[in-house]
Amino acid sequence: MNITVQQLDDIRKSGETHTLLDIREAEELAAASISGALHIPMNTIPENLDKLPTDQPIVVMCHVGGRSAQVQMWLHGNGFENAVNLEGGIHAWSLSIDSSVPQY
């Protein structure tokens, strides 16, 4: 399941409880980030499942949405039915929601 950056912006503005999971690598995080995101690189997700909430939506984010779609499907298959993919990733967020987030 996917959500748009507009939907995520609405969730954040409403104060609805959620976790924004940034699965990008550290170098990408240094280039651009969204405040409040939980950073767990994609290749370390399996060993960090205990850091993920089971009682709220998890919005999985990467650069443009490809890796996060894979992680969302994997999480869903491993019991995190509340995981959704952020379409377009941080790139779409920068273009449509917050131009202060650098593009790379």
For the regions a language model picked out, list residue spans one by one.
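Rhodanese-like catalytic fold shared by cysteine-dependent sulfurtransferases
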Residues: 1-19, 26-57, 66-104
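Short, surface-exposed ligand- or partner-binding patches at beta-edge/loop junctions that are enriched
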Residues: 61-62
